[in-house]
């Protein structure tokens, strides 16, 4: 038996783990006290990761769809040769607009992204669709306007805040904050601190709160606007901070002062006394921060919500300070900056949608495939994603994917999307390869965890860097690795820390500019084989995939040399980044990469004047338009995608991992159930404009009347059986989304629920 250090892959926290491995199986999973961020924390979901690693639907070898619709086993050589031929032919006949990529690695599979994006370059395409773009792109767009770059990302210093305002999030189940349950417990126990939760359901986090504002679903924008109006009208805004660091407050102030405060509070259906208490406490606190999540990012007014929640900490000056909201450093670039005003980014053919942070929204993908125009999407690569179940309107995805000329899926399991593919390519799991995540969101101390492989892969499963490098070679895009670079990488003494190779590699790309887009694979084939960490166990699987991290470490050290040195790394202007890279490579528990000081947070602002630009005309218009928005209250509103104790993302396919709620019950207020003749455990039919689902009812008096909830992470077929629980996106509509970012309104889906016996038969 061996004990291996790795990390959880279920949410963006990526907590460190120690896993006992015996005979190729996980025998015990516990938190890793040596992890620089999580420090031993473990939740119940991570403790069941053996069900991800060992389940029966693992892909064993490449598959090709036959004319009869079945799959046949093929070799890697045949699969990649045929794919190379098809991709070249598609590019030559239809150009780059005919090709798109969907994926990005989920919550912990990000290292392959440097390699998969090269395929887009080879295909002359920029169309990247990602789950992030059905969750967070409205937030990224707001960041670009406020701070000057869509990559400027905000975190929250909850551990040191006197007042914590959580809006549309349930960290007790969803995590998203450091060591969530410990942090919530500490907040609750401290009488000098105040926890406020805004949520239409009395969640586990809301039960721990000092104040729970149980808003009517979809009215968060009205509540946040009311809080801001109160702060301004009572002159609680931080004039000193606004004068020193912001511009455009005058236009915002004018809008807030004329806002119909009482009407907005009534629209949210909360008590004015509670709103006043929260506004005053937040504004007057020594330190305060805001934490938000999908509850407002996938609800009505999504992009406006992202603007208003940031205004709460900006207007009060709780930004760039201990216990406030702050920027953070980053190593792995998972986002881009694609401001549509620059005029250089490609809109989609049908919706004329521009990318946000380099990403296009999944909500429009079926339409872009079915578009009758010549430049519609004809071929799609799906990597580590299952959009058939996770994208809005499953029926639309199934219909659109059936019309593709080429659908290729790279995954560890035979997903619902893979079942529709022309080729299915087996990837190694996240514990069978070198891997990492780009969700390094901490401030002032930030860390990066390069996870070492702790198990050998299945015989024909390959890591994504190898898959995409081989494909580029088969397409003729990537020449054989230059012998001189390979020799230099092998010969260069360790004391020069690869700097000679870096200089030679840069010179090679300068002379061969066509190959610059393929730098990751070139480093993989040249420097990669020479990366041999001292840790013997990891040496059995090549660390070549980590080679591009050298360039990223050098860049970070150039941008933030003092922060890198404070994190414990030693070196001069030339060697500091190489020293950081070596630490990343050698430390299986993860390593600190930067240690900032709070007053440095403002340095991340990218506007030329170094100020926060509060006036965003498009969003001020949306804010003003709330006054005239008609109040429409559906019979029932479905919250699609509730976080529960035993649901996670799509990588948990084996239903045996769940200790409770095996059917993914529909939660409903007892009075709503009684009005429909339903009791706990009854079967019912939940119907929306797009479809119907049979569900099991569970009574929950923590819900507001008029709302029901279903969990995400269900509906997968296991070992060829029926769907395990609800396929919730049979109920969601692609057009029911934010008008700016096209993020879906999953948390506000109008539905009807009826006792199954009284329902019309399903078609």
Feature-to-residue mapping (PLM):
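Long, contiguous, secondary-structure-rich segments that constitute the structural scaffold
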Residues: 464-517, 521-522, 654-667, 671-763
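Catalytic, metal-anchored helix/loop core of enzyme active sites in primary metabolism
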Residues: 422
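Extended redox/cofactor-interaction regions of prokaryotic respiratory oxidoreductases
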Residues: 114-188, 193-196, 221-225, 310-419, ...
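Short beta-alpha connecting loops at secondary-structure transitions
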Residues: 207-215, 432-437, 446-457
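Active-site phosphate/pyrophosphate-binding segments
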Residues: 227, 245-364
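N-terminal export/assembly segments and adjacent metallocofactor-ligating motifs
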Residues: 1-234, 258, 263, 271-272, ...
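N-terminal leader/propeptide and maturation segments of large enzyme subunits in energy/redox metabolism
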Residues: 67-72, 234-272, 454-602, 660-662, ...
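Acidic/polar loop patches that form or flank catalytic/metal-binding clefts of enzymes
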Residues: 27, 238-239, 275, 289-290, ...
